[in-house]
Amino acid sequence: MHIKKGDNVKVIAGKDKGKEGKVVSTEPKKDRVVVEGVNIIKKHQKPTQFNPEGGILETEAAIHVSNVQLLDPKTNEPTRVGHKFVDGKKVRIAKKSGEEIKSNN
Protein backbone atom coordinates (compact mmCIF):
# COMPACT_ATOMS: atom_id res chain seq x y z
CA MET A 1 0.00 0.00 0.00
CA HIS A 2 1.42 3.39 -0.99
CA ILE A 3 -0.14 5.32 1.93
CA LYS A 4 1.36 5.09 5.42
CA LYS A 5 0.36 6.25 8.89
CA GLY A 6 1.22 9.94 9.36
CA ASP A 7 0.96 10.86 5.64
CA ASN A 8 -1.00 13.93 4.58
CA VAL A 9 -3.66 12.99 2.03
CA LYS A 10 -6.53 14.54 0.08
CA VAL A 11 -9.85 12.76 -0.48
CA ILE A 12 -10.49 12.55 -4.24
CA ALA A 13 -13.81 10.66 -4.26
CA GLY A 14 -16.87 10.17 -2.07
CA LYS A 15 -18.95 12.36 0.21
CA ASP A 16 -15.88 14.08 1.71
CA LYS A 17 -14.24 14.86 -1.65
CA GLY A 18 -11.77 17.74 -1.40
CA LYS A 19 -11.03 17.40 2.32
CA GLU A 20 -7.45 17.01 3.50
CA GLY A 21 -6.17 15.27 6.61
CA LYS A 22 -3.54 13.13 8.25
CA VAL A 23 -3.71 9.32 8.10
CA VAL A 24 -4.46 8.03 11.61
CA SER A 25 -4.27 4.31 10.82
CA THR A 26 -4.08 1.87 7.92
CA GLU A 27 -5.63 -1.54 7.27
CA PRO A 28 -3.43 -3.06 4.53
CA LYS A 29 -5.36 -6.35 4.28
CA LYS A 30 -8.58 -4.46 3.53
CA ASP A 31 -6.89 -1.62 1.55
CA ARG A 32 -8.46 0.99 3.84
CA VAL A 33 -7.20 4.05 5.72
CA VAL A 34 -8.64 6.20 8.52
CA VAL A 35 -8.14 9.93 7.86
CA GLU A 36 -8.41 12.57 10.58
CA GLY A 37 -11.70 14.51 10.31
CA VAL A 38 -12.96 12.58 7.26
CA ASN A 39 -15.90 10.12 6.94
CA ILE A 40 -17.38 10.92 10.36
CA ILE A 41 -20.04 8.41 11.46
CA LYS A 42 -22.38 8.36 14.44
CA LYS A 43 -22.09 5.27 16.61
CA HIS A 44 -24.78 4.42 19.18
CA GLN A 45 -23.07 3.33 22.39
CA LYS A 46 -24.87 1.36 25.09
CA PRO A 47 -24.15 2.37 28.69
CA THR A 48 -21.20 0.37 30.04
CA GLN A 49 -19.17 0.28 33.22
CA PHE A 50 -16.57 2.60 31.65
CA ASN A 51 -19.11 4.90 29.96
CA PRO A 52 -22.22 4.89 32.21
CA GLU A 53 -24.04 7.50 30.11
CA GLY A 54 -23.69 5.78 26.74
CA GLY A 55 -25.12 7.95 23.96
CA ILE A 56 -24.18 8.75 20.39
CA LEU A 57 -20.46 9.02 19.64
CA GLU A 58 -18.98 10.56 16.49
CA THR A 59 -15.93 8.74 15.13
CA GLU A 60 -13.95 8.43 11.91
CA ALA A 61 -14.59 5.41 9.72
CA ALA A 62 -12.13 3.85 7.27
CA ILE A 63 -12.27 4.73 3.56
CA HIS A 64 -10.79 2.83 0.63
CA VAL A 65 -7.22 3.74 -0.23
CA SER A 66 -8.19 4.40 -3.88
CA ASN A 67 -10.32 7.35 -2.71
CA VAL A 68 -7.35 9.25 -1.27
CA GLN A 69 -4.23 10.69 -2.86
CA LEU A 70 -0.97 11.60 -1.15
CA LEU A 71 -0.07 15.30 -0.92
CA ASP A 72 3.28 16.30 -2.41
CA PRO A 73 5.56 17.52 0.43
CA LYS A 74 7.02 20.26 -1.80
CA THR A 75 3.92 21.72 -3.52
CA ASN A 76 1.14 20.42 -1.21
CA GLU A 77 -0.80 19.16 -4.26
CA PRO A 78 -2.15 15.63 -4.79
CA THR A 79 0.38 13.36 -6.47
CA ARG A 80 0.94 9.74 -7.38
CA VAL A 81 3.60 7.74 -5.56
CA GLY A 82 6.65 6.13 -7.12
CA HIS A 83 9.49 4.08 -5.66
CA LYS A 84 13.23 4.47 -6.11
CA PHE A 85 16.32 2.85 -4.60
CA VAL A 86 18.60 5.27 -2.73
CA ASP A 87 21.73 3.85 -1.05
CA GLY A 88 20.26 0.34 -1.29
CA LYS A 89 16.98 1.33 0.39
CA LYS A 90 13.62 1.56 -1.34
CA VAL A 91 12.09 5.03 -0.80
CA ARG A 92 8.81 6.61 -1.87
CA ILE A 93 8.94 9.61 -4.20
CA ALA A 94 6.28 12.08 -5.35
CA LYS A 95 5.71 11.73 -9.10
CA LYS A 96 4.98 15.47 -9.59
CA SER A 97 8.08 16.95 -7.97
CA GLY A 98 10.40 13.96 -7.62
CA GLU A 99 10.74 14.83 -3.91
CA GLU A 100 11.37 11.98 -1.45
CA ILE A 101 8.41 11.30 0.85
CA LYS A 102 9.50 10.96 4.45
CA SER A 103 7.36 8.98 6.89
CA ASN A 104 6.31 11.18 9.82
CA ASN A 105 4.76 8.61 12.15
Swiss-Prot record:
Pfam families: KOW, ribosomal_L24. CDD domains: KOW_RPL26. GO terms for molecular function: rRNA binding; structural constituent of ribosome. Transmembrane segments: none annotated. GO terms for cellular component: ribonucleoprotein complex; ribosome. Part of the 50S ribosomal subunit. Belongs to the universal ribosomal protein uL24 family. This is Large ribosomal subunit protein uL24.
